[in-house]
Amino acid sequence: MAKKSMIEREIKRAKMVQQYAAKRASLKEITTNADLPMEQRFKAQLKLAELPRNSSATRIHNRCQLTGRPHAYYRKLKLSRIMLRELASFGQIPGMVKSSW
């Protein structure tokens, strides 16, 4: 199980990404628009650099909802491979059955 501080840190990052998403998107739009003057695009790039680091979506790391494990993460289920196997073997995931042929 991951430390609670790491899980809380990821939650905090996710909130910050949502908070700054619109501002970050508008600044990125300005910096990539070739029709605008270079000076205006450069100022937008500087403003983008002034935003908090944790407001970037690339800083978020997917973690298991039950254990907080960061590796072997299944996006559709939001679980790690270990919890997926455990819950599936107990029949707690609807529609998932052990394969046999």
Swiss-Prot record:
GO BP annotations, alphabetical order: translation
Protein function: Binds 16S rRNA, required for the assembly of 30S particles and may also be responsible for determining the conformation of the 16S rRNA at the A site.
GO terms, molecular function: rRNA binding; structural constituent of ribosome
Protein name: Small ribosomal subunit protein uS14
Naturally occurring in which organism (per UniProt): Cereibacter sphaeroides (strain ATCC 17023 / DSM 158 / JCM 6121 / CCUG 31486 / LMG 2827 / NBRC 12203 / NCIMB 8253 / ATH 2.4.1.) (Rhodobacter sphaeroides)
PANTHER family on file: 30S RIBOSOMAL PROTEIN S14 (PTHR19836), SMALL RIBOSOMAL SUBUNIT PROTEIN US14M (PTHR19836:SF19)
Gene3D superfamilies: 1.10.287.1480
Entry's family note: Belongs to the universal ribosomal protein uS14 family.
Any one Gene Ontology cellular component term annotated for this protein: cytoplasm
Keyword Ribonucleoprotein assigned: yes
Keywords from the UniProt entry: Ribonucleoprotein, Ribosomal protein, RNA-binding, rRNA-binding
Keyword Zinc: no
Protein origin, superkingdom: Bacteria
Record's subunit section: Part of the 30S ribosomal subunit. Contacts proteins S3 and S10.
